[in-house]
Amino acid sequence: MRFILFSILGTALVAAIIWLGAIDTDNNDFQAFQTPITTTTTSTTTTTTPTTTVLSPKTPVGTLPEIKIEGAVTLDNFSSISTVGLDTVTFGMTVNAAQKAAGTRFSPVTPRGECFLAIPDRGPDGITFWIIENTVERVDVENELIRTRSGVGIGDTELLINELFGEKIETRVLPNSSEKLLIYVPSDSSDKDFRVVFKSNGRVITKLWSGRLPWVEMTEIC
């Protein structure tokens, strides 16, 4: 009996050892084939560019007193500039009279004072009136479609201006620049205080204006 009992116990012990060895082998195999998990974090950098707001000279900075306007707008891309004004708006008109003549209200683009600039609320772009002590004394044109009564304007050459008006043109070179002012001086004594000015880059006209002295010959905003 004892022999049989020892045989059974020995067999059981061997079986247990073999089973434990199998478990260890399985664990070693798991560790060998387990792939480490790597987590990659992507950092995103957002760059914000500051927005700079530039106040344009043609941006309204206020309003003029309310005025009743009757009729249609009279200024358009076919308007013509002359020594005395722009179509129905003539130099010497009060602000109210000029707005009524233009068929639209004006809005200041520089602070109101004894001298300020204003643009029409309706009509073509590129028109700026100079208001001096409540009267219109000058108009600047930066619209290539608006031309003189002779049909010249922005984009035309200095040569054409000189050929067309001859001795009535006085040329001034702006300091430290290749730009020039070609100034039309009327021969009629009744227009002696008026001028039409063509500004060039040295070759072609880039801007024009007209008005009364002394404001018409100013190169800086009043």
List each model region and its residues.
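Extracellular mucin-like PTS domains
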Residues: 36-63
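Positively charged n-region of N-terminal signal peptides that target proteins for export
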Residues: 1-4
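Hydrophobic alpha-helical membrane-insertion segments, chiefly the h-region
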Residues: 7, 11-22
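Hydrophobic single-pass membrane-insertion segments
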Residues: 18-32
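A cross-family detector of function-defining hotspots
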Residues: 30, 93-132, 158-204, 210-213, ...
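Second-shell loop/turn segments in exported
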Residues: 82-89, 145-152
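Short acidic N-proximal helix/loop "leader" segments that mark the beginning
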Residues: 60-80
